[in-house]
């Protein structure tokens, strides 16, 4: 039975340790499961022979909290957690969230805002010279100058604000071991400048080190156009085979240097990483607090792949995991699934077999294996590349094996499915088996919008592709004698989306009968194309101007249009229709969205009847219909 890594001096004593090689400070609760970045990095280091202690959610108001495990021999590792701490804390309207799924008991407030920076500064108050190495999603996506939505300003590289010595971006398994080995061999942390997948800072750039020089921070902060240009240079240098080393100046005597990304892991390396001895659950010290809610989403799920060549503008995966797909072998996944079947809480259902995009189980084309992804072209956008190989045969074979495992009743796919890639496959085998075996009544996909010029800014396929998918989905369901639904994820207020576009989306919802219970407003998170559009008003790919809905009232109108049937939204919907010049949608005909006057408030007895339906009543089917109509979505899990 695997043991958790030490979280206290007592645990260290039990192992006979007097000092950790690394103390890993994390913003999440300690969950030893490969869906949590800190679990993978700590187990990879342990596998390489290093002693790692875990310091989870230390009290940032108390400098002594980071000393609980003593000074590490080689350095501190710092991660904000599985999410950027600001996304974790705040909704898109900048309101404080009430719960934190990555904290024991779901309690909010156990980590600071800008957690990586705060933790590092806390360490520096006590340990002046001990190396600090930062990583994880927060550090990775803030590695160079970036727009910060919450402060509404362009921030410097997190490496500078955190006073850290080295930043590891991307997934980090290979680079962390290389860094550890260098430090273990006696190398000074400031000399560790040669490892791919790292970012470091220097007083003077090495004239013998070829770099692509980005605009300096002062000019970026002064001119949004410069920032858009700089970001696109970064965007075109994310492939490990072709990326150049990037240099970002901060004044005359401070520079941040980003080395090219790490090469993708081989299948053997992926298998080894996921085959390490994880406890696969949260630390037992959290039991009295109710455990860690986030484990419920992944405990009986399988991570099949990494990377994504989908190119959604609002997604940062290209910056973090890259575009080249990396997969685990069937044997590795079957072994993990078989082990799941012996867990006492396993009920026979594998919740997911996927990754960033479930149906990407191979590189987009053969060229990517040796030359990487094209720096100036996308695989699926604006339409599938002629060199792309759309093939689900390996995924189909894997799913069949999983379905046949003793103790497995059903295998679900809950990661995002790219419907354009699905349609590009000439074989219908996967589509048919997806419908027959792997959906629990509804399939969640992410068309995001219906206006083609908005979809172009999003990096998504045109609306006609989604309609073709719906027709095929409906046809296969009918052939299989099944009645399953589609849940479309839709987004309001994305750059490029005007009020008229929002009205067009509302008309589509009217025509399909879909009534979304949840509406996702565009969230400008660090290091996405869409965020750069939001900040600069420019599309970095073309440098053309983009309309950006920033006014809170307009954003509220766009959201209200997606839920125009809600009486509480009547005033906003009417105002939006008038401003968009669409008063033809106010009236009594079937195509109208609202009546000329607001709806009457429901009577109290009617409200009571709605809240407490009679036992003989059937469950409401509001929002659910046969394809191409869609069911009202449950809590979103991801967008592809």
Say what each PLM segment does.
Residues 84-93, 141-143, 173-178, 202-205, ...:
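Flexible glycine/acidic-rich beta-alpha junction loops that bind and position SAM and/or redox cofactors
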Residues 25-30, 289-316, 349:
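N-terminal pre-triad scaffold of radical SAM enzymes
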Residues 24, 55, 59-60, 339-487, ...:
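Conserved SAM/AdoMet-binding glycine-rich loop
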Residues 37, 56-251, 258-259:
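Glycine-rich beta-alpha loop elements in corrinoid/cobalamin-binding modules
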Residues 22-26, 67-68, 192-198, 287-288, ...:
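Flexible, glycine-rich loop/tail regions that form catalytic "lids" or insertion modules at the edges
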